[in-house]
A protein has these predicted regions:
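Short, charged low-complexity linear segments at domain edges
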Residues: 1-17
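Conserved beta-strand termini and adjacent loop/short-helix elements that scaffold enzyme active sites
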Residues: 6, 187-189, 216-217
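Canonical Radical SAM [4Fe-4S] cluster-binding loop centered on the CxxxCxxC motif
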Residues: 14-49
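A secondary-structure boundary/capping signal
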Residues: 23, 71-72
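Conserved alpha-helical substructure of the radical SAM core
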Residues: 37-68
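Short, flexible loop segments at the rims of nucleotide/cofactor-binding pockets, characterized by
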Residues: 44-47, 73-74, 97
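Conserved AdoMet/S-adenosylmethionine-binding subsite of the radical SAM
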Residues: 55-67, 76-203
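Charged phosphate-binding loop/patch that engages nucleotide di/tri-phosphates or the phosphate backbone
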Residues: 202-217
Length: 217
């Protein structure tokens, strides 16, 4: 398993649970606004974290954390993701999976076999703008399939989008709501200076007032 890092404690990544976060290495999207180039760009990859070391740590946290978040990068491109999830569940911990929805076959397998407890899918844009935002040619049918599987699953779920000023509009959000419904978690873009693309700045952040207007539009 290609594990780039582990965050030992998080109070926000798994809603309602104290968790640890496993970051997988590698992604099949190249979203310019991504703030984790070290997880996406091969030339920025660091050394892997040994899976054995991750589980040695998790065993010391039993009774102190309630769950583990598997994020990326994009976890579903990892061929041994199912095995990793099963090992975490064997410790009695809940599992939340973050995904970009590009691998519906893997998601269906995971959902149908009830391997995870929570799934969060990051939506990038209206479907007609997906490839432009993601920096690669995206198979939109796969995105639609993933949305369908997640929406119709009986596990906890979250659809979220990072709103970027100058890129996303109220009309874009309305288009996404037409597919998902109103239950979307809207996150504001935050400029870090460490994005995959070099065309982003503080100007791409919405103000608090603008975000409130965006949410209620």
């Amino acid at each position: 398993m290609k594990i780039a890092a582990i965050q030992k404690l998080s109070l926000i990544d798994y809603p309602g649970m104290i968790s640890s976060v496993i970051f997988t290495q590698g992604c099949n999207f190249l979203c310019g606004y991504c703030h984790n180039p070290s997880l996406v760009l091969p030339q920025s990859f660091g050394d892997f974290v040994l899976e054995a070391d991750v589980f040695d740590f998790l065993k010391t946290r039993i009774g102190k954390i309630e769950g583990v978040v598997i994020t990326g990068g994009e976890p579903t491109i990892q061929l041994d993701l199912v095995r990793l999830i099963k090992k975490i569940k064997a410790l009695g911990l809940s599992v939340k999976l973050d995904t970009n929805g590009s691998n519906p076959g893997m998601l269906k397998k995971i959902i149908d076999n009830k391997l995870i407890d929570f799934i969060a899918m990051d939506l990038k844009a209206p479907l007609n703008k997906y490839s432009a935002i993601c920096g690669v040619n995206v198979d939109i049918e796969k995105i639609k399939q993933s949305i369908f599987y997640i929406k119709n699953s009986d596990i906890e779920k979250q659809f979220r989008i990072t709103a970027i000023k100058g890129i996303h509009s109220v009309e874009d959000l309305d288009s996404i709501k037409g597919i998902i419904g109103d239950n979307i978690t809207l996150q504001n873009f935050k400029f870090s200076g460490k994005h995959i693309g070099n065309s982003f700045s503080k100007e791409n952040e919405f103000s608090s007032k603008e975000m409130d207007e965006f949410r209620t539009a």
